[in-house]
Amino acid sequence: MRILVTGAAGYIGSALVRALAAHEVIGTDQSAPAAVLGNIAYPQFARSLVTPEIDTVFHLASLVSGGAEQNFELGSKVNLDATRDLLEACRLAGHCPKFVFASSIAVYSGVDEIDDDTAPAPQLSYGAQKLVCEVLIDDYTRRGYIDGRALRLPTVMVRPGSANTAVSGWASAIIREPLTGRDYNCPVRPDTRMACISLRRVVDAFIKLNELPGNVIGPTEPYCSPVSRCPRSKCGTR
């Protein structure tokens, strides 16, 4: 199997590339150890990555939440436009590759409880960009251009090295910094709760999501209730 991984030099991407070592993996990023170096924000580069030989695209490259909020134009280019360029490359390649997308729970609002019925309501540009990409992936899948699936990630921790610009970066820092002998002033209240996941489980989830057949995952479809049921559900029956 020939696999393309964008964001291959990142925290999640590099771990995913290692886990896929049994396959032929083409990793791309702006820095080593990615095999193909380039900026996915440039349309020509993004569209050159998908060839008819690619079986699966893992699209992990993104500008994280804080960065996308600070620089709307760059966030739109990296998170939204580059994703559409990759989708177009898949469409033009003409062989319906799998397209596994790293989405985010940032598509939701700040509610405490989230389940499968929770409606998306992003509060940041990053979440809005991820949600738009999900809709595009649904449509490209519906039309038979790709076999798309998306994973809405919570905070992945503990991220090594220096902090990135993610809004939730403090969650790794409160563990990482003391372990390296550095003080850290936590910017949130002591009773703050957030969804977290380990790197190993994220990598496993991506691989399992890729292996699932499309008919098991199923399309994202709204349920339309007959108009006659609306008054009944609101007012009851006699």
Give residue ranges: language-model regions.
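N-terminal Rossmann NAD(P)H-binding glycine-rich loop of SDR-like oxidoreductase domains
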Residues: 3-22
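Rossmann-fold cofactor-recognition segment
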Residues: 30-43
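NAD(P)H-binding glycine-rich loop region in Rossmannoid oxidoreductase-like domains
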Residues: 40-78
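Glycine-rich NAD(P)-binding loop of the Rossmann-fold in SDR/ketoreductase-type enzymes
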Residues: 70, 74-85, 120, 124, ...
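Conserved Rossmann-fold NAD(P)-dependent oxidoreductase catalytic core, especially the SDR/UDP-sugar
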Residues: 84-124
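Active-site Tyr-X1-5-Lys
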Residues: 110, 121-149, 180
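NAD(P)-dependent short-chain dehydrogenase/reductase
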Residues: 138-193, 199-207
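Mid/C-terminal beta-alpha module of Rossmann-like enzyme folds, strongest
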Residues: 208-238
